[in-house]
Amino acid sequence: MTRYQTLFTHLQRRQEGALVPFVTLGDPTPSLSLQIIDALVESGADALELGIPFSDPLADGPVIQSATLRALQAGVTPERCFTLLATLREKYPQLPIGLLMYANLVVNPGIDTFYRRCAQAGIDSVLIADVPLEESAPFHAAAQRYGVAPIYLCPPNADDVLLQQLAARSQGYVYLLSRAGVTGSDRPCLPPLRHLTTRLAALGAAPTLQGFGIQTPDQVRSALDGGAAGAISGSAVVDLIARHLDTPPQMLQQLRAFIQTMKAATRA
């Protein structure tokens, strides 16, 4: 079984959902980034979704854009990110680790080269935010060659044709969007998406993880009650980093408390 399959099977037995935080690699510095990720994992994160800094992050809201800028200003490059990823894989051999990318960072070194490096670093999945399903063939093929799960976005207005395509191609998990737009939101209520999770499950799709706007334990619970296997929280995590840039010990303490509270909601 893959790491994702092992995780979802384990959580299902325990009647828990998955909590998957997102952070940008190297934010605010490479060394502190590793400490942040340690805090997330030690506090209950079931898997990680990690971003490689890119100068034009179209799908990201201002919070994650700022994180990207901080990492770039700290000199973080894709090369440095792969070094960090290799360190994380060695430290956490069973933890599912996914990348959330933009196509330029995959195309520039060569699609085949990029996925080969992912496999060498022990990456479980890659989601390319700006490549729609209908343009994904070369990326999907390379991912398959190197045993990396290609992750696809399921929008809240997906029709049945798209759901069938997602189910047929899905591996690892399906990223279920709470809403359209960019990451981060102050909306307290998530739209009901059980019709999507139910249909995807009936079609044999990989488990769904719901993201975009997941900032509170109640929203985690809402995602799980709607049939998602877990929740991805990014902007809320990155916002805590931004608020405590000058006081790293307090930052790490706040992150631990947040993850513990969010993870507790997966067990309710």
Curated annotation (Swiss-Prot):
Pathway: Amino-acid biosynthesis; L-tryptophan biosynthesis; L-tryptophan from chorismate: step 5/5. HAMAP family: Trp_synth_alpha. Keywords: Amino-acid biosynthesis, Aromatic amino acid biosynthesis, Lyase, Tryptophan biosynthesis. It holds the Pfam family Trp_syntA. This is Tryptophan synthase alpha chain. One of its GO terms (molecular function) is tryptophan synthase activity. The gene is trpA. The active site is at residues 49, 60. GO terms for cellular component: cytosol. Tetramer of two alpha and two beta chains. InterPro entries: Aldolase_TIM (IPR013785), RibuloseP-bd_barrel (IPR011060), Trp_synthase_alpha_AS (IPR018204), Trp_synthase_suA (IPR002028). It catalyses: (1S,2R)-1-C-(indol-3-yl)glycerol 3-phosphate + L-serine = D-glyceraldehyde 3-phosphate + L-tryptophan + H2O. The alpha subunit is responsible for the aldol cleavage of indoleglycerol phosphate to indole and glyceraldehyde 3-phosphate. Its EC number is 4.2.1.20. Gene3D superfamilies: Aldolase class I. Belongs to the TrpA family.
